[in-house]
Amino acid sequence: MAEIGKTVLDFGWIAARSTEVDVNGVQLTTTNPPAISSESRWMEAAVPGTVLGTLVKNKAIPDPFYGLENEAITDIADSGRDYYTFWFFTKFQCQRLLNQYVHLNFRAINYSAQVFVNGHKTELPKGMFRRHTLDVTDILHPESNLLALIVHPPDHPGTIPPEGGQGGDHEIGKDVAAQYVQGWDWICPIRDRNTGIWDEVSISVTGPVRIIDPHLVSTFFDDYKRAYLHVTAELENKSTWNTECSVNIQITAELENGVCLVEHLQTENVLIPAQGRIQHTFKPLYFYKPELWWPNGMGKQNLYDILITVVVNEFGESDSWMQPFGFRKIESVIDSVTGGRLFKINGEPIFIRGGNWILSDGLLRLSKERYRTDIKFHADMNMNMIRCWGGGLAERPEFYHFCDIYGLLVWQEFWITGDVDGRGVPVSNPNGPLDHELFLLCARDTVKLLRNHPSLALWVGGNEQVPPKDINEALKQDLRLHSYFETQLLSDKDSDPSVYLDGTRVYIQGSMWDGFADGKGNFTDGPYEIQYPEDFFKDTYYKYGFNPEVGSVGMPVAETIRATMPPEGWTIPLFKKGLDGFIKEVPNRMWDYHKYIPYSNPGKVHDQILMYGTPENLDDFCLKAQLVNYIQYRALFEGWSSQMWTKYTGVLIWKNQNPWTGLRGQFYDHLLDQTASFYGCRSAAEPVHVQLNLASYFVEVVNTTSKELSDVAIEASVWDLDGNCPYYKVFKIVSAPPKKVVKISEFKYPKAANPKHVYFLLLKLYTVSDKAVISRNFYWLHLPGKNYTLLEPYRKKQIPLKITCNAVMVGSRYELEVNVHNTSRANLAKNVVQEDEKRDLGLLQKLFSRCVVSADSNRGLKVVEMKGSDSGVAFFLRFSVHNAETEKQDTRILPVHYSDNYFSLVPGESMSFKISFAAPTGMKKSPRVMLQGWNYPDRFSVFG
């Protein structure tokens, strides 16, 4: 007997190029089922995935993201569509009982397909962003069932001009498909245009009645004390008789330690005509003071489990549906002060600091594990919004699930871009896809797929463009707000809000319209190049209230370059000086192919890497690039935060990550190693933040929370390269109001007598009563007209450190707590926030000339001491985790979650860190946690 429910078909798939298969789909699923053998052309398939992903998995082609290997892979424009038309085949078992019904579900296929089940053919219509459900009840076998699909690429894969370009020749825009696949200024072309069964395939077994696309909506009254849950679901009766059934809804809240409380249980009786469909709306369910869902930085992400079941008389449970749901309300208007779009969550304004997202992987190798890491990384950076760019995907439910979990609001665009749809060079087609009804069908289906996620904040018609007029008008109508979400009132005359397609979120026609950029669609987003850090704070930097795209550099660490390129890609750029004194960087061919963006902008910005001296090699270049990365992105967010609500309502960085091994605009690379910009962003976007305005040199406190800060003070200390503290000051603050920026006082050290050319500044915001640090911010600065070249000899300083590490292993996961203490001393006034390490951990063993270790096996505790006779700042320290067993050149274990990284410690200061990661499968030795820094060029082990 088949159990009621869903079975995912994600293993056992094989594939072959259609031109190399001599039999048809009927034969494949009856008399001639294929198998992998030395004589056949069949291979293990990546499902979900793409043709290119399958070929890479089987090493039939090189890794397109390594070096220049993509140039060795045949492009569909040269081969024709048949070359990337593939058969996919698998077997499944499903024994059903009388009055059970079985459906075969495809959550997405690119671009069209014919499906064969046990010799029966079904034509699947076109479109990359639509679901397909096939009733296979009457064609199933009691034992093994054979399933084959022939999947065809997009109808208009286009060609790639020699110069590349934004979306190639723009032909892909004639289809309802992802547009980035023809290449952009940040990615190479994807040779198969993402052809494949790229999302979940499943078999679902139900009784006579099945549940289709429930819609959950919450409304609030009395200042969020009273709430109602509105639910509408479509019910389909597959049987040939009128069916009486009960529809049950259960709402469960998790209290703690896995203990759950059923908050509501409601049953309603319905009659469904034979082979008919009805839309059933539940009586609204009342809640008193529900636990609200909040975005990252505003509160907890409280979720309730909503379970809907349908029980058919004389049959039993027929179907069930479950969805985590967050009670929250999103409002969005154009702000009267700034002209920017303002968002409110549960009545509170939220200052948007987020970034643009393309997709997790350019070959659509999507997984829950990768999505979890991607989204947690964004939360770790203290971001609160992700924009799903219109040239990419309608993101998957797993993406949204983790945005729900970690509190990331999502701006979801439909599949229109200015470059491809009317504003490109050469001028592209302004009429969008050829089939407008197909576009709208995919859009409506996407809304139904995603609308129950609390993280989903708004729909947008396109990137830097609006959809064609008829599509745009249809979307405006389909996605119109229910009256409650416009007037805040719910009348008995109003229809239930859950009967709308959405009705709860705004639809904005394009990314530069209606409160974004100049609001009129002119190209007023950007810029996308390196900037002087102080410029981000200037009132003249950006005119408008909300910038949907502003970007900069994105160089990863040297280990990533070596892991993703052969040795000829390890050469650093040439620095060519022009007649105007500006430096032009000339990268090698591989870096250019991987879309490297230079750290100079001749005529505007002097090379920021050369501010630290000419790099000697790849390691030196990448380390200095990380220094620039940290400053650049911290300044970007701090500059916007400095004018919160007075000039700006939000900003989204272009872009957060790369779906391939690109070298442009990223906080972490495709291998999932964070750059220093990740931690610069994390610092700048913390909910309560102390910062230095780099334009005015005023110390500021940014309070984005709803709570007033009182009984707080700021400690400012300057440290020179000799380890002295020539400046120390405590600023007493009476209060910092909620949702406000408070300018405290001018930082006057640069105007003092004989200030140092290069110096360090440490700011700490703390509560006076208990000295608890609320915000810590460390700067390295130079006087006007100077640079950071004095930091080069500072590398020779031997600053002593003491590192204490305590590790806990749960399954394959390691959870480490590490304390790093700069044990050097300097003459300074008493540090009111200074933390001292007081543990005495016994016998030491010498490991290196500067490093000694002790361990307590009973407590899982390890202590490492780095010897040093110099006093000063331990500068720009970085953790990394390594596999001691691997023979690969790249020994890193990735991903790793660090509570902070790329940090510096002043004399006498200590900081604690949390490090979390999963050990690789089969690894027997303990992983090694390493530490290195500006003063510690040779990384040393602190654990393992």
Swiss-Prot record:
Keyword Metal-binding assigned: no
TM annotation in the entry: none
Active site per the UniProt annotation: E464 (proton donor), E549 (nucleophile)
Superkingdom per UniProt: Eukaryota
pH influence on activity: Optimum pH is 5.0.
One record GO biological process: carbohydrate metabolic process
Cellular component terms (Gene Ontology): plant-type vacuole
EC code: 3.2.1.152
Molecular function GO terms recorded: mannosylglycoprotein endo-beta-mannosidase activity
Catalytic activity from the UniProt record: Hydrolysis of the alpha-D-mannosyl-(1->6)-beta-D-mannosyl-(1->4)-N-acetyl-beta-D-glucosaminyl-(1->4)-N-acetyl-beta-D-glucosaminyl sequence of glycoprotein to alpha-D-mannosyl-(1->6)-D-mannose and N-acetyl-beta-D-glucosaminyl-(1->4)-N-acetyl-beta-D-glucosaminyl sequences
Pfam families listed in its UniProt record: Glyco_hydro_2, Glyco_hydro_2_C, Glyco_hydro_2_N2, Ig_GlcNase, Mannosidase_ig
PTM info: The mature enzyme is proteotically cleaved into 3 subunits of 31 kDa, 28 kDa and 42 kDa.
EC class of the enzyme, as a word: hydrolase
Alphabetized UniProt keyword annotations: Glycosidase, Hydrolase
Job of this protein: Glycosidase that specifically hydrolyzes the Man-beta-1,4-GlcNAc linkage in the trimannosyl core structure of N-glycans. Does not hydrolyzes pyridylamino derivatives sugar chains containing Man-alpha-1,3-Man-beta or Xylose-beta-1,2-Man-beta.
Family: Belongs to the glycosyl hydrolase 2 family.
Protein name, entry field: Mannosylglycoprotein endo-beta-mannosidase
Species this chain originates from: Arabidopsis thaliana (Mouse-ear cress)
Source organism phylogeny: Eukaryota, Viridiplantae, Streptophyta, Embryophyta, Tracheophyta
